[in-house]
Amino acid sequence: MKYFFIIASFVLCEISLQAQLFQDAGAISTSMAGLNTNNNNVWSVNNNIGQLSKLEYTTISISSFQPFLIKDFSTSNIVVGMPVNEGAFGFNYSNSGNKHLQMHNLGIGYSKKMGSNFHSGMKINYSIINAGDFYNKRSVWNADLGMSAALSKELELGVIIKNATLSKIADYNNERLTTNFQIGASYHFSKDLIVQTGLEKNINYPASFLAAINYKPNEKIIINGGIASNPSLAAFGISLIQKKFTLSFATQIHQYLGWSPDISIIYQFK
């Protein structure tokens, strides 16, 4: 029965082909219900490219995400971020699927510090979709945009646009990749406690309200949690910091489809 609901949801929502190309990446993102506008780490390569220019060291990370505990939906990611002068370059590769539907995504992005309080960036993605006899093999280019602005020491705003190019998959029925917008604000109550809120809008679906919290009880542990309204889900996770390594565990709980675990390992070349 669980498999039936999962398959039906993917078909009815038309996300089996579109959404995974824009899957939020990294366990930190997963633990905050996909609220990514004001998170700054190496996973900004995939999430908010505008935040990548805040990266202090060359960093590499890998992750494995399994939606609804279904092996065939598993997504593996690798990202690299390299600071340069007043900006940073980022690279990513991800793959997901099984023998019937495979997706590969390769991306390169650049983020730059535009003054003391504003950061912006752009990322170019090349995606390959192999869906066997139905779609055959297709490839498509698209671009993501991201930016953030510090309004004060405590308050920050961020914006993400995924597939700003409205890239087309096929001429038939004007089939295009979906475009996603996210705008959010974060407030630093202290150096150890950050609360975030935001709105996410896919051009094909109703808007979703997002909220998340980031708490650092000590120098080696970070605890995250988040909620989203559409679809209705809750998320939580924990990160363990050990010198140059950060190990993150997270999961999301969908109202109907269940658990989606994620694990990430980050290494900084300090």
Per-range role (PLM):
Residues 1-20:
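Bacterial Sec-dependent N-terminal signal peptides
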Residues 20-270:
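Subset of outer-membrane beta-barrel
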